[in-house]
């Protein structure tokens, strides 16, 4: 794309690095996406790319869990329904400060489901780098300390698997990590509670 795709995830999607992913009651196409999380440390509005990284406090691992049915078929090209479900935003385990990460554009990342390799990549292949993203998003909204921008995912998501897509189901275990930022482990569980 010419410009970054921007969507919101609800606060209720945020969980810890090792918390469960709870499938929505009508889930049929819940997918995984390892992403680099960029945590804003200083208010940013109309920031130039050359100054963008001065507004970053640090980085973390994010699993941008996505229900593709909600995202693609029930949203009229607005992705938030499919990406903002409860528990669909595991972050952490740590916020690693920028002084510890010399180059956010050269971090290996990986994700496995039930011990099987699904995603392998490096942040150097991102379509838009961290500075590009901070500068671009700051044109449209004020970024506040604590805001998190996630940066896109490498190949290997379930909907892209051949010969046919694979999606998460109750009982699956997702493990993922980024070099220098730690690892996550989530168990996938069926919906619990009231509809």
PLM ranges: what are they?
Residues 9-11, 32-42, 60-65, 95, ...:
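Short, structured patches in soluble enzyme cores that scaffold and shape functional sites
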Residues 40, 48-62, 68:
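RNA pseudouridine synthases
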Residues 19-26, 34-36, 40-44, 111, ...:
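Hydrophobic beta-sheet segments that form the core/acyl-binding groove
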Residues 1-25:
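Extended, compositionally biased flexible segments
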Residues 13, 20, 44, 67-68, ...:
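Active-site/binding-pocket entry motifs
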